[in-house]
Amino acid sequence: MKFTLSWLKDHLETDASLDEICDKLTAIGLEVDHVDDRSYLKGFVIAKVLTAIKHPDADKLQILSVDTGADKPVQVICGAPNARAGLVGVLALPGTYVPGLDVTLSVGKIRGIESFGMMCSWAELELSNEHDGIIELPEDVPIGASFAVYAGLDDPVIDIGLTPNRSDCTGVRGIARDLAATGIGRLKELSLPQLGTTFETSLDVSLDFSQSALLCLGFAWCEVRNVQNNASPQWMQQRLNAIGLRPINALVDITNYISFDLGRPLHVFDADKIKGNLRVRCGREGEQLQALNGKVYNLGVKDCVIADEEGVVSIAGIMGGERTSCDETTRRVIIESALWDAQSIAQTGRALGLISDARYRFERGVDPAFMETGLEIATELVLRLCGGEGSKMKIVGYQQPEIRQITFPLSEIKRLTYLEIEHEQTMTILTQLGFDSEGQGNVVVVKVPTWRPDIVGKADLVEEVMRIYGLDKIKPIPLESFMEVKDPVLTVSQLRSRITRFALAGRGMRETVTWSFISEKQALAFGGGQAQLKLVNPISADMSVMRPSLLPGLLVAAQRNADRGFPDFALFEVSNIYEDDTPDKQHRVAGGIRRGTEQFGGAGRFWNGNARAVDVFDAKADALAVLEACGLESGKVQIEVGAPDWYHPGRSGVIKLGSKIILGFFGVFHPATLEKLDISGPLCGFEIFLDRIPEPKKKATKSRSPLKLSSLQMVRRDFAFVVDKMVDSSLIVRAASGADKKLIHSVQVFDVFEDLSLGEEKKSVAIEVALQPIERTLTDEDIEELALKLVENVTRMTGASLRC
């Protein structure tokens, strides 16, 4: 929710500073996400170019004589292609800080001629990326005036992050009400218009719903004739621009303004484009609407719409249609203020993928008691800005909302917060927030205002009092200390799962959590797909069967990473698999796969050639590592042939304990299995049944902590350096690694080349540098800057030169 400081002060009488207001907003739960304070623009003035003469010593420069509103013109040297006599633009005088250049101007000489300022572009003021020429303003702007004041940029923009329950603060007035309750200012009285209506509108509206599906809870409308739909006033345009809305015309801007000012969404129709009367109903199969955003939406039978005799004219509560939109030719309008079912609005918006400011407010809940008043305020504003004459208001389907009452023991505050607050202060806070109360003593009946649908119980009232009184006044109370737990808390299964995770993470594998249900094709490929494991109501066809193995999910995850440029990958998961639907056929399993060259010792390229592809021995080592971690010595198990047919028959094995207990399988995957799943190799993997491992007689071994991985994608760049033969390649690696120890994840030599073309006693050493972003994705400029620093480091420490 964005608003400007002056906009807030239309509703809140206060002398508090911007910082004080922002601090108070955050303290009461309306957290300030960002403040756009462009006070740095106050030094820029509007100026007019009187003359433009070519610079005698430069082809692209001109000597400008600029009128700043002072007695004497200012001489400015300018190289903009659009600089010319008569142009009105923005001038920065000496001493002004230019944010786009990060410099403070001073008087300087350019090719021997003094310049006493600078005509600025939009980019230099950081107002847009346009830098092809200097700013051009209309000729009727006041010369010498502050550009920031003229453009409305002297008004700070505050952006708060609203939680979904605070629908009352989707308007500036609701925010002002909360601030007034803190004592930082006084809430101004809302001026209610007195409309002098002159006629009855001829348009009728009907609500066509069954009682079981009443999607419109009230519909009010007025007609205004003889309007002039010109541009909205500058003050309104400046505020809309400040919060990111594009001004369109007076009628549309008024509805947008009231939506953000008072939290009351409205819609305005061109009455001359409406055919017949309006019906509010559910959509029909095959109906479409070209909305105001230019897109065409296919409507369904669950979507609430407004229609005339020719079809749908608006998606109710979300967005109007292009056919009845208002433009400069509009002379007669219908202004609509309605109440829509919040759940219906949310469902329609999600189904259509349509987001709007109206939907944002209606699906959270608007004030039902403000429907008529909001329409009156909008009508008065239309009459004031667009002229014309207004009709009497018509209303259908509306019933006054019931006032929710909550019995509130004031002792609840102390019980929940351990704070003693005087009863009088408690009631004052509630009154300032708009709550009424009845009764005396320690228990009162509180009437909840209609704009607070989130207040449903006495705990909510305690929260309201506390956020205004000050959450910082609640003293932290430490939890009671408990005696050390002597008996084991974790079961054997839980302990083994934890130990296994540590062991596999210590071998460089990444833990994965995949779905417990997979497609029937995947299940059949791994010995599953039985009828009793099929879901009755699956999420999708690809998730219709309980998994018989962890491997299908891991293989799909590895392929997804390979498709995105990470062919070398090692994944594991510790979870359950299912042989059938009985409890004793559900097994706790540790499964893992390795892809490409992702061995235990690392993947990638080396100076003496590419690393080998993973094979059966890598899978065997991982499987045995799990057994060792769980306390079973690998020397006690037997390795035999006979792994399931999803493994390669000659490159796989079965791990047994004795002749009967099968602990797991490992091996390279069968090409036919990979082909069924549309997965490319090389790939190997294993599965160990954790619940079949005998309990150890000694404490399980410990392993290293798991890796801390960034969620951002790693970037790799190759560099080749020509260096003296006697220089050790490790020195190049060390020099490259030192360029940025935070971003550079690893440096590896993958090629060493010698040839006379490089020069006598020279060699080429190629390295791969892996960059791991931490806070944000790296831009091309970031990578280029780091590359230059890396080359500089290597050159300085080894005498090498970058090979082109």
UniProtKB/Swiss-Prot annotation:
It is found in: Cytoplasm. The keyword Transmembrane helix does not apply. SUPFAM superfamilies: Anticodon-binding domain of PheRS (SSF54991), Class II aaRS and biotin synthetases (SSF55681), Nucleic acid-binding proteins (SSF50249), PheT/TilS domain (SSF56037), Putative DNA-binding domain (SSF46955). It catalyses: tRNA(Phe) + L-phenylalanine + ATP = L-phenylalanyl-tRNA(Phe) + AMP + diphosphate + H(+). Gene3D superfamilies: 3.30.56.10, Bira Bifunctional Protein, Domain 2 (3.30.930.10), Ferrodoxin-fold anticodon-binding domain (3.30.70.380), Nucleic acid-binding proteins (2.40.50.140), Phenylalanyl-trna Synthetase, Chain B, domain 3 (3.50.40.10). Residues 401-476 form the B5 domain. Its cofactor is Mg(2+). SMART domains: B3_4, B5, FDX-ACB. Residues 710-803 form the FDX-ACB domain. This is Phenylalanine--tRNA ligase beta subunit. It comes from Bartonella henselae (strain ATCC 49882 / DSM 28221 / CCUG 30454 / Houston 1). The gene is pheT.
